[in-house]
Regions:
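N-terminal glycine-rich FAD/FM-binding segment characteristic of electron-transfer flavoproteins
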Residues: 1-148
Length: 148
């Protein structure tokens, strides 16, 4: 994580106006990473009927919650989410972004990385902060080895 911004942004996927478990787990990880580096956690949610989502995401560790509640976000469409998420990324300027390794999360992460010309690591199993940098570990070779 950079010295200028130690923030972690988490894109929380929603299902039937409720955050999926993976999103809540990533908020816990983000909270741990932010606490170890003196940063903050920003949660972003897209969907409809998200009136109480902010309180829930704050309870799971978000310092700031950005809700995008509109009919266009009722189901996942990367083309619909990407412009708003790109603007959020530029405005928040996090050091690290966590997006779940789901079908929609992977689709969104790759498109976002391409649009913003940033690195992306998919399928990560662990991440920590070591000397101000976030080494990530993921499986390779069918789970027979790990790469960092």
């Amino acid at each position: 994580m950079t010295e200028s911004n130690n923030g972690v942004l988490v894109v929380v996927e929603m299902l039937d106006s409720q955050p999926i478990d993976l999103g809540l787990e990533m908020l816990g990880l983000a909270r741990r990473l932010a606490d170890s580096s003196g940063g903050t956690v920003t949660a972003v949610a897209f969907g409809t009927g998200l009136e109480t989502t902010g309180e829930l995401l704050s309870a799971y560790g978000a310092d700031q919650v950005l809700i995008n509640d509109h009919e266009i976000f009722a189901s996942f469409h990367a083309e619909a989410w990407l412009p708003d998420l790109s603007k959020i990324m530029v405005g928040v300027a996090p050091a690290l972004v966590l997006i779940g390794h789901s079908f929609s999360g992977t689709d969104l992460a790759l498109r976002l990385a391409y649009r913003l010309v940033v690195d992306v690591a998919t399928g990560c199993e662990s991440i920590d902060i070591v000397n101000g940098r976030p080494p990530m570990t993921r499986s390779c070779f069918g789970g027979l080895a790990r790469e960092v």
